Swiss-Prot record:
Assembly and oligomerization: Interacts with RTN4R.
Protein name (database record): Dyslexia-associated protein KIAA0319-like protein
Residue ranges with Polar residues bias: 1028-1037
Gene responsible for this protein: KIAA0319L
Keyword Glycoprotein belongs to the record: yes
Length: 1049
């Protein structure tokens, strides 16, 4: 069962921890060595089956392994013997080396460079065995059998080991005879190259560039190249042996590694060997490969004695900003020999990310650190002297400057608020409260308010209130920060009672939105009034002046807001009723900061190119993010090679060098918080084979008025390379009325409106990229409205913008009452402005199922008749005119009806019977012939003239005739003379004179008759005589005197 070695206690440290291997235990190590050799002998004899593929290589004592970054070492459990460890390694294809340490089997995979690192344990109880597997020998890089061990930068000189006197100082528990006996036993199973060789390491100083030399052997005739195996992270498996001579100390291998310098001269004295510890920047090891250019003598070299120095860098230091300076001192327990000094080298091993600071005295005993940033720093000091070496470690912890807590500040918005019923809910925002760290708790409490069932108490940033009753409220907000500090403030809310006579403005409840939503609609249509509201007006409250916002519909019940930013906006709604009374209400819109979302990458639509076009642009500018996109990256993920991307780090990139095939380009976008998104676009490159396009319109269109819009679909047109332009044209024989919407005559689908009765013909011309074109035609037939003759229009005395849906319903209900039908039977077809102050409403009336439509002229006549009977204020709006939409007057078959004025235009020699128009139904007509009217008028005038002359003549004659006065006389029977008196002006003077001297005057009967004498009253006498006695006409002689009888008469 395998168990990988990660960060675990070092097995070898068990040997080093207590220095329990003292001189008194040497016999135990000798016995252990003997047991090990015996196990190896049994192992080689019992593995004949595995000998063909797995053979023992080199065996080394006092050497251990450590991993070079990854887990290349693993502990094999359940292997109580060396034989079982060897067999398990042979069976595992990944095992090339195993390390037998104190009964533990540690296997290793060192097939790759820099995967393993060797170090010296100086303990004979540590054995490193190399295995040669034929199938992996090349991968491991084993040398021929006559070569020396080379793995992991380890080299040795068997002759120098054999002749070196101080080897017992390194492994005092192993005698020379025992060592060579074990080697002879192992050589029985292996080749001459499998000699077990002790390790002799030579150190050489490195130059200032911190480069490491390689370890080489002096027993080979070849020079080895240095191959560096390094790793920034290693697992320390070290062992240290104590109990040797007092002047010899064995140190664990330092993390930088050991290096040797090859020498061509034989070392005569091991005590005079110079040992220097290199100081590389990164830890590294090297091992040698053979080079036939140089050779060295296989002579013995003395083993150097290295004195271990006890070095202390002091206790760990902990400082707190703003203090950022510290001083580290290195102390060596042993004093340097006379005339010599120690050298110091401080190295930074561990440091925080994004650290900074300054070091002073890196190669001195005292290291001064300054300008440190917060974090943990680990320093190592290396002290070296003549054949002496030591290391010390110290930690420096820099803590950030402690924060001085400031109490939070409670902020409410709005602080003073007033609402009126029927609005019974609102919100108060406390999220704008601030603190130097963080607010962890909000608490709302009602301090004062009307008597209700329960008081308000909530623990939210925004207080939402509902079911409020009239009165004054006071709410307290208490905020608590992360350090427990508190702060409070209050907010006042006034809820007014509803009044019935002025209007009640209601701007709706307060709203809360979260960015990126920056638009909202406020509704003031809940405002009420007992007689109706005539105007609405929205405005930004003075407390919110200066804030950026776009407002639309400020004079309508609905206010549309956009382009809002973070913060609180307060708006005021002012409503006015019919008599000019006004009311206001406020609403607060709280815009909270947004929550970041990943960007949305948009690489644009797929593209299709045709050679010779070999370049195009990739447009990712439509990519979006709720905050901001900070980087773009275009990459080719599929397609032929050879393309070039220009401006690949911008939203719009250019790709050139395209060939025939399909390319896939991927766009990656990132926002400010490093969230990213990807999108791909396909670019298809084709050979240049152009075919003309094919224009195709989907069928003819037939519509019936009042529907006056149509849609012509030319999207079925096709082309092999794609259509680049569409052009719709109207035939010259088509009606000129009708409009094209939104410039759709340059798009695949044509939208038409305001069409009139008739047949339209349209032509579609499509053009491709090469200029080839094709055309197609279609017709749009507009049929007349079948209900045209039954439509009734009424002109209302109201502006069209003031006619609301509610008022319209009330008016339709009144019309239904006049006509005796239901509201649902009146179908309003159109409402449009007639003049600036009037509105035209077009409707028709139908009965209950089967929905038979009433005749329009009958409905109009009935409505006119009912309106004459009713009072003037029966309708909510005054009806200026009621008529049919189409003029249906027959004009007495002597003219035609004007559809606009709804009056007859008579034919020549015909005119309107105005008597009938004024006295009867008022409909225009053409009943009278002009000729007959003239003749009749002439006759009437002549008749009137004659009649008038006759009357005048009669009047004059009657006035000019004098009254006849009766004169009586007594006539004799013989005298039959009669007398006629005619006192007229026509008789003249002579006639009068004749009358005076007539026989009547001189009748004797008058004088002589005494029988009949008539007497006149005095009054009558005077009148009669007065006219005769006044004067004498000119040219007349005085009459003779009358006789008494005449006087009496």
């Amino acid at each position: 069962m395998e168990k990988r070695l990660g960060v675990k206690p070092n097995p070898a440290s068990w040997i080093l921890s207590g220095y329990y291997w003292q001189t008194s235990a040497k016999w135990l190590r000798s016995l252990y060595l003997f047991y090990t050799c015996f196990c190896f002998s049994v192992l080689w004899l019992s593995t004949d089956a595995s000998e063909s593929r797995c053979q023992q290589g080199k065996t080394q004592f006092g050497v251990g392994l450590r991993s070079g970054g990854e887990n290349h070492l693993w502990l094999l459990e359940g292997t109580p013997s060396l034989q079982s460890c060897w067999a398990a390694c042979c069976q595992d294809s990944a095992c090339h080396v195993f390390w037998w340490l104190e009964g533990m089997c540690i296997q290793a995979d060192c097939s790759r460079p820099q995967s393993c690192r060797a170090f010296r344990t100086h303990s004979s109880n540590s054995m490193l065995v190399f295995l040669k597997k034929f199938q992996t020998a090349d991968d491991l890089g084993f040398l021929p059998e006559d070569d020396v061990p080379h793995l992991l930068g380890l080299g040795w000189n068997w002759a120098s080991w054999r002749q070196s006197p101080p080897r017992a100082a390194l492994r005092p528990a192993v005698s020379s005879s025992d060592q060579q006996s074990l080697i002879r036993k192992l050589q029985k199973r292996g080749s001459p190259s499998d000699v077990v060789t002790p390790i002799v390491t030579q150190h050489s100083k490195v130059n200032d560039s911190n480069e490491l030399g390689g370890l080489t052997t002096s027993g080979s005739a070849e020079v080895h190249k240095a191959i560096t195996i390094s790793s920034p992270l290693t697992t320390d498996l070290t062992a240290e042996l104590s109990g040797g001579p007092k002047n010899v100390s064995v140190q664990p291998e330092i993390s930088e590694g050991l290096a040797t310098t090859p020498s061509t001269q034989q070392v005569k004295s091991s005590e005079k060997t110079q040992i220097a510890v290199p100081q590389p920047v990164a830890p590294s090891y090297s091992y040698a490969t053979p080079t036939p250019q140089a050779s060295f003598q296989s002579t013995s070299a003395p083993y150097p004695v290295i004195k271990e120095l006890v070095v202390s860098a002091g206790e760990s230091v902990q400082i707190t900003l703003p203090k950022n300076e510290v001083q580290l001192n290195a102390y060596v327990l042993q004093e340097p020999p006379k005339g010599e000094t120690y050298t110091y080298d401080w190295q930074l091993i561990t440091h925080p990310r994004d650290y900074s600071g300054e070091m002073e005295g890196k190669h001195s005993q005292i290291l001064k650190l300054s300008k440190l940033t917060p974090g943990l720093y680990e320093f190592k000091v290396i002290v070296e002297g003549q054949n002496a070496h030591g290391e010390g470690y110290v930690n420096v912890t820099v803590k950030p400057e402690p924060r001085k807590n400031r109490p939070p500040i409670a902020i409410v918005s709005p602080q003073f608020q007033e609402i009126s019923l029927p609005t019974t809910s609102t919100v108060i925002d406390g999220s704008q409260s601030t603190d130097d760290d963080k607010i962890v708790q909000y608490h709302w409490e009602e301090l004062k308010g009307p008597l209700r069932e329960e008081k308000i108490s909530e623990d939210t940033a925004i207080l939402k209130l509902s079911k409020l009753v009239p009165g004054n409220y006071t709410f307290s907000l208490t905020v608590v920060d992360s350090d427990g500090a508190t702060n409070s403030t209050t907010a006042n809310l006034t809820v007014n009672k509803a009044v019935d006579y002025p209007p009640v403005a209601n701007a709706g409840p307060n709203q809360v939105i979260t960015l990126p939503q920056n638009s909202i609609t406020l509704f003031g249509n809940q405002s009420t009034d007992d007689h109706g509201i005539t105007s609405y007006e929205w405005s930004l409250s003075p407390s919110s002046k200066g804030k950026v916002v776009e407002m639309q519909g400020v004079r309508t019940p609905t206010l549309q807001l956009s382009a809002m930013q973070e913060g609180d906006y307060t708006y005021q709604l002012t409503v006015t009723d019919t008599i000019g009374q006004q009311a206001t209400a406020q609403v607060t819109v709280i815009v909270q900061p947004e929550n970041n979302k990943p960007p949305q990458a948009d690489a644009g639509p797929d593209k299709e190119l045709t050679l010779p076009v070999d370049s195009t642009t990739l447009d990712g500018s439509k990519s979006s993010d709720d905050q901001k996109i900070i980087s773009y990256l275009w990459e080719k993920t599929q397609g032929p090679d050879g393309v070039q991307l220009e401006n690949a780090n911008s939203s719009v990139a250019t790709v050139t060098g395209l060939q025939v095939g399909t390319y896939v380009f991927t766009l990656t976008v990132k926002d400010e918080r490093n969230l990213q998104s990807q999108s791909s676009v396909n670019v298809i490159v084709k050979e240049e084979i152009n075919k003309p396009p094919i224009a195709k319109i989907t069928g003819n269109v037939v519509i019936t008025l009042p529907t006056s819009t149509a849609e012509l679909d030319g999207s079925k047109s096709s082309d092999d390379k794609g259509i680049v332009s569409y052009l719709w044209t109207r035939d010259e024989g088509s009606p000129a009325a009708g409009e094209v919407l939104n410039h759709s005559d340059h798009h695949p689908i044509l939208f038409l409106s305001n069409l009139v009765e008739g047949t339209y013909t349209f032509h579609l011309k499509v053009t491709d990229a090469k200029g080839e074109s094709d055309t197609d035609r279609t017709t749009v037939e507009v049929k007349p409205d079948p209900r045209k003759n039954n439509l009734v229009e009424i002109i209302l005395d109201i502006n069209v913008s003031q006619l609301t849906e509610r008022l319209k319903g009330m008016f339709i209900r009144q019309i239904g009452v006049l006509l005796g039908v239901l509201d649902s039977d009146i179908i309003v077809q159109k409402i449009q402005p007639y003049t600036e102050q009037s509105t035209k409403m077009v409707f028709f009336v139908q009965n209950e199922p089967p929905h038979q439509i009433f005749k329009g002229h009958e409905v109009a006549a009935m409505l006119k008749s009912e309106l004459r009977k009713q009072k003037a204020d029966f309708l909510i709006f005054r009806a200026l005119e009621v008529n049919t939409v189409t003029c249906q007057l027959n004009c007495s078959d002597h003219g035609h009806c004007d559809s606009f004025t709804k009056r007859c235009i008579c034919d020549p020699f015909w005119m309107e019977n105005f008597i009938k128009v004024q006295l009867r139904d008022g409909d225009s007509n053409c009943e009278w012939s002009v000729l007959y009217v003239i003749i009749a008028t002439f006759v009437i005038v002549v008749a009137l003239g004659i009649l008038s002359w006759t009357v005048i003549c009669c009047c004059k004659r009657q006035k000019g005739k004098p009254k006849r006065k009766s004169k009586y006389k007594i006539l004799d029977a013989t005298d039959q003379e009669s007398l006629e008196l005619k006192p007229t002006s026509r008789a003249g003077i002579k006639q009068k004179g004749l009358l005076l001297s007539s026989s009547l005057m001189h009748s004797e009967s008058e004088l002589d008759s005494d029988d009949a004498i008539f007497t006149w009253p005095d009054r009558e006498k005077g009148k009669l005589l007065h006219g005769q006695n006044g004067s004498v006409p000119n040219g007349q002689t005085p009459l003779k005197a009358r006789s008494p009888r005449e006087e009496i008469l």
